[in-house]
Every structure is written in C-alpha cells, then in structure tokens.
Amino acid sequence: PTVSGKYADVIENNVCKNIGFGKPSVNDTNALTSGVGCAAIFAGMGTSLPNTIVKNNVVQNCVETGIEGPYELVYHNTVKNTGENSVARYTGSTEAIYIKLTTEFEQKYIGNTIETRGLRCFSSYSNRDDEYKGIYILNNSVNLENTDASITCNYTRSDIEINCKKIKKIVIENNAGMMKDKKSVNIYTDKGYVMDYFSIHNPCMIGSVPEKARYCFNINNN
C-alpha cells in the first residue's frame, strides 16, 4: 500500500484496551443515542490533517468505535470487541472502523482483522454536498458477531455501509468473513449521481448499491 504526497503522520504499534467502559444499569436495555461513546484511535474532520497512516495497532474492548478518522491508509490493525455495551444497548454508531470522508485523497483500508458486537465492521456517513475521492476496502477479515436474541435492535446491521451524496470511487474486494445470509454491503448515493468506478467482489449478500457508474466491475451477489 502507498500514500500520496511527500510526507505522512503515522499512528502505529499501539495497544488500546477497555476504552470508555460505562456499565448500564441493571435491566437497562434502552438504546444509547447516536454518538454517545468514544473511539480508541480518533482524528477529527479537517482539511489541515496530513495524509495519515494507521497501522499495526490493536484495539480491544471499546464501547463504540475502534478507529475513526479521515485517514489515507488504515493497514494491518486488529480491532476486537467494539460496540461492547451494544450487546445490551445498541447505539446508532457502533462501528469497528468509521471512515470520515475527505475530498483530498482516496482512503484505503487494507488487511485489517475485525470482530465487533456493534452494528457494522466498516461504516461511513456524510450529508455534505462535497464529492469525495474514494474508498478501498480490501483483504480484510471481518466478523459481525451475533448478539443476544432477546435484545431488540432498531438499526440495520451490516458488514459495510457507506452513505454519502457523492463519491467518485468505491472498491470492496477480497474481504473474508462477510455475511451470506443477510445484506452484507449497503452503499447509498444521491439518486442520479454517476460514480467514476464501482466494484464489489466478495462472497457476500449485497443490499443497496449506487444507481449509476461510468465503470462497474465484478458486482457479485452470492
């Protein structure tokens, strides 16, 4: 994997455990509101960020998100047991990895190992009118763990969900462990928007996909 530009900040070789562990009251199964919780590795949105690499980190036991930010490369990280409290109380934002979109560079998520009790393994959302560069999700191992059947979840669980108005390119390929019995991948863009390039090639069940793309490759559903 490579990054663009002449320099990059690197977040690497960290171990983050037991992040933001607040215990719910006895018999409290009410969902937390979206955004209540924390992230183990976090960078806020901003155009002043350098092109950052996040690699070889371990995140284990986190209330909400393991890795969150507008990073250029997230590579070879292990993220386990995120959404830890969501086995009892789901929030609207319990992802193992949350992708904050940027218009400055394409974002690559490669070779990560994910196990989460949360809603999604990878997720991204923006309601801005910006046209984002692109997302690559490649060669990751994912496991959206089962939860207690007695707990009601009012949100859609999926391995990957990307929801934004405009993005030039999405490539989701060669990821292992994705769901085959439920909608594993859901991509939402503006109606009528034409992407440059779109590809999904995994053994998984595909849900929503963009309406139009100049070039579509390997859209499989098995």
Predicted regions and their residues:
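Ankyrin-repeat and related helical/solenoid repeat scaffolds used for protein-protein interactions
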Residues: 166-209
